[in-house]
């Protein structure tokens, strides 16, 4: 046999070789129907921008891929599909900018993305790829709409919505930042009244919130969702006008009712016209017109100066019997509670600010330790933990929590109050007045009304419009395609009209994980047997920026489909982990700063495996890190060291038959490294796993590495540097994929050192440390301690009166 001479590590040739080998052998293919130990490893499918993958994408995908590869080595049948979220305003706007139809642009972008994703070594099974723009996919998006429509969860109603003059479409509240569009930070968002389709997600507010308590999700993600759902426990209290109008208000603090000195209605409240006097009508109407043009997010802002006008009318405070003035103000929103509040300026900051501005009465009704009914209020005091009621006849002196229940019960007995739970969450507006999206499958007939498109007629295919530019009319460009929207009514056959709005792109991504296992099926959206086998998703990794929109909507759609009998589970993701953010040289990446990292450049220069490991080594995966060009060379040097060890082991094995035995110290370190790396990889602590492998490699270089030691190292490296590990595995004499070899064998007994360090104390003070054999008996350890010169200085030859002995840890000599 000819000697094989050591060679240098060439990442480009190694990676090209193994990507081709994986393709030929079907290494990354999963037996989806026949899997015995299914593990669905999901990563957030990307929007295929023209710019291609950015480093944030790669950071997210590689972290998820490492988890999938680790689970495969652990014996699972891992399903790691990928697809493309290609509908939506981003694609449409870019197409308009470059003058190319999105139907031409998107396939080119997807092709580039797919090439890049393969290049970085993802273990994706591309046979199950989905594209949201494919009619074979959005047929089922439309089917889901129809299921919710028939279940009463999809409704059309007129509503005040956020309208971006630049995007020329409706925005969700989450897309409005400080009153401006998130996509156009210099464009002020307007309010418009439009007929829109909504999914009634508010009906699921309670389970959406309650299920978070037991969800195995990143704590930060759960907190964001819980705050967005925003449960408030309180009471609905009725104020009556002299004319008999009942104005219900929601309050979380009925104990402060005696301090309610005025009422405030939202300008949109239906009773405003009824309670406004003729003297105040002109002022009130003008104010309502001004507020109607404001966006809801700005109105909610705590920093915004409060404005309002008096209606001229009064209502009766049900607790005091006093008449309180009725105002309207922009800081009260119709979409929360009842659209009316009882203002308690003594104990609410917004009410205090408004009362000071309008010179309205301010009364203390809760006093803390050292305060009484006459203690002045320099500012609102909303939270008084040990507060008791004052200026509240019949309840003075009661703790506020007790008074809260008592006042609610007393008013409930009179029919003037009832306990109520409110939520901050609003229904999901899915209508979009744009072109590039799935048409909403509804037909309007003058005779039959609103008619769902029959399922047999799905998909409602998006027509190929040459002119798809949006306008300011409040309707979609599809409203200009008369030959498309004019259709016979499915019920009566008369000429009818299609819905011309398209659905929100977040609906596309709210169910894509359900489609993956059945992506090759045209007869069902998701096969019942496959869905039961693979769902809920075992591991989902993505960005926290999707906590409110995508993740909330995906949970809602799954819950709705369960209630409608289509799936057997309520929660789609068994585990979710939010990854961190990558910055460049301490600064957030942006084109304007010129510090955007192009992954292709680094993969070309350093290789995909070096790039993968460097990204994972930047810092804790769930926090992110700072990308600095100087750091990546250290990872390359590490891989070069491993390569040299493998090459040396290969040539020595040829010469000596590979019969060498490793030292006990190296065996012990190998097992300790296996323990650390497998544990850290499972918990996504990738940076510390890599650090442990680096320590192990340094020890191997200082010792005599054998094939067993290097095989264990190669298996540990496989999730992180898959091409590199495959090549090392082959060079160590194996003919099958490293991904089929399993995790290295771990023996806890061999990870424990034979010797331990005893702390020796004299009278409770540390005087020395001794290295002794593990399991040393007490009498032997005490004798060794007494013989230690450092200890003898303090014992002066005396025998101890008492010995405190902790096996393998402590000898304390008490004289």
Model-found features: residue ranges?
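N-terminal catalytic cores of NTP/NDP-binding nucleotidyl/phosphoryl-transfer enzymes
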Residues: 31-102, 129-144, 251-252, 318-354, ...
């Amino acid at each position: 046999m000819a000697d094989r001479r050591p060679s240098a590590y060439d990442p480009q040739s190694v990676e090209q070789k193994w990507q081709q080998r994986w393709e030929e052998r079907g290494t990354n293919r999963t037996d989806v129907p026949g899997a015995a130990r299914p593990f669905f490893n999901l990563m957030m499918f990307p929007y295929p921008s023209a710019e291609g993958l950015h480093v944030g994408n790669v950071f997210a995908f590689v972290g998820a891929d490492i988890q999938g590869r680790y689970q495969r080595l652990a014996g699972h049948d891992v399903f790691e599909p990928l697809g493309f979220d290609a509908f939506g305003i981003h694609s449409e706007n870019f197409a308009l900018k470059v003058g190319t139809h999105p139907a031409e642009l998107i396939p080119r972008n997807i092709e580039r993305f797919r090439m890049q994703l393969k290049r970085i070594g993802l273990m994706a099974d591309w046979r199950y790829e989905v594209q949201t723009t494919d009619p074979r996919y959005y047929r089922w998006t439309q089917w889901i709409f129809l299921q919710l429509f028939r279940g009463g969860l999809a409704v059309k109603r007129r509503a005040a919505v956020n309208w971006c003059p630049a995007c020329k479409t409706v925005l969700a509240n989450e897309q409005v930042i400080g009153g401006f569009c998130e996509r156009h930070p210099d464009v002020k968002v307007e309010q418009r009244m439009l007929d829109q389709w909504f999914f009634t997600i508010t009906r699921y507010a309670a389970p959406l919130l309650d299920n978070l308590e037991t969800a195995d999700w990143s704590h930060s993600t759960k907190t964001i969702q819980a705050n967005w759902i925003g449960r408030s426990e309180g009471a609905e209290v009725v104020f009556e006008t002299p004319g008999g109008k009942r104005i219900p208000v929601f309050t979380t603090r009925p104990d402060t009712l005696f301090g309610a000195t005025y009422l405030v209605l939202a300008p949109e409240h239906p009773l405003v016209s009824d309670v406004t006097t003729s003297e105040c009508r002109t002022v009130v109407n003008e104010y309502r017109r001004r507020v109607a043009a404001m966006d809801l997010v700005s109105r909610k802002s705590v920093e915004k100066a409060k404005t309002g006008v008096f209606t001229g009318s009064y209502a009766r405070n049900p607790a005091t019997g006093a008449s309180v003035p009725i105002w309207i103000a922009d800081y009260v929103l119709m979409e929360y509670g009842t659209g009316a509040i009882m203002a308690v300026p003594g104990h609410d900051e917004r009410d205090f600010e408004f009362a000071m501005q309008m010179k309205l009465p301010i009364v203390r009704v809760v006093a803390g330790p050292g305060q009484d009914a006459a203690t002045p209020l320099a500012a609102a005091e909303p939270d008084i933990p040990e507060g008791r009621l004052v200026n509240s006849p019949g309840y003075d002196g009661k703790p506020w929590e007790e008074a809260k229940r008592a006042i609610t019960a007393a008013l409930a007995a009179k029919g003037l109050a009832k306990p109520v739970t409110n939520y901050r969450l609003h229904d999901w507006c899915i209508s979009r007045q744009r072109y590039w999206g799935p048409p909403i499958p509804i037909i309007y007939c003058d005779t039959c009304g609103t008619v769902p498109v029959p399922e047999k007629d799905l998909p409602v295919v998006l027509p190929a419009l040459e002119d798809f530019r949006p306008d300011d009319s409040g309707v979609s460009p599809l409203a200009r395609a008369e030959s498309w929207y004019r259709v016979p009514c499915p019920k009566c056959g008369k000429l009818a009209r299609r819905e011309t709005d398209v659905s929100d792109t977040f609906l596309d991504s709210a169910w894509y994980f359900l489609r993956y296992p059945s992506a090759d099926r045209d007869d069902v959206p998701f096969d019942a047997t496959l869905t039961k086998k693979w769902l809920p998703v075992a591991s989902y990794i993505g960005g926290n920026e999707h906590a409110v929109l995508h993740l909330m909507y995906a949970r809602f759609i799954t819950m709705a489909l369960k209630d409608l009998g289509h799936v057997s589970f309520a929660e789609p993701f068994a585990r979710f982990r939010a990854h961190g953010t990558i910055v460049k040289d301490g600064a957030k990446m942006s084109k304007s700063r010129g510090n955007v990292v192009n992954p292709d450049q680094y993969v070309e220069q350093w290789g995909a495996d070096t790039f993968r490991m460097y990204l994972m080594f930047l810092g804790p995966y769930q926090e992110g890190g700072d990308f600095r060009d100087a750091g990546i060379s250290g990872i390359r040097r590490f891989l070069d060291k491993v390569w040299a060890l493998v090459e040396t082991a290969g040539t020595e094995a040829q010469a000596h038959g590979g019969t060498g035995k490793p030292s006990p110290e190296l065996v012990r370190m190998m097992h300790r490294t296996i323990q650390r790396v497998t544990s850290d990889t499972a918990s996504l602590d990738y940076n510390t796993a890599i650090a442990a492998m680096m320590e192990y490699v340094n020890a191997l270089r200082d010792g005599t590495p054998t094939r067993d030691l290097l095989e264990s190292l190669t298996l540990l490296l496989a999730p992180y540097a898959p091409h590199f590990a495959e090549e090392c595995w082959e060079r160590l004499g194996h003919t099958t994929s490293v991904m089929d070899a399993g995790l290295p064998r771990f023996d806890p007994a061999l990870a424990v050192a034979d010797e331990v360090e005893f702390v020796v104390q004299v009278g409770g003070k540390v005087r020395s440390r001794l290295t002794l054999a593990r399991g040393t008996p007490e009498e032997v350890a005490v004798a060794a301690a007494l013989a230690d010169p450092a200890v003898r200085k303090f014992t002066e030859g005396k025998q101890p009166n008492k010995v405190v002995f902790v096996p393998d840890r402590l000898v304390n000599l008490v004289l």
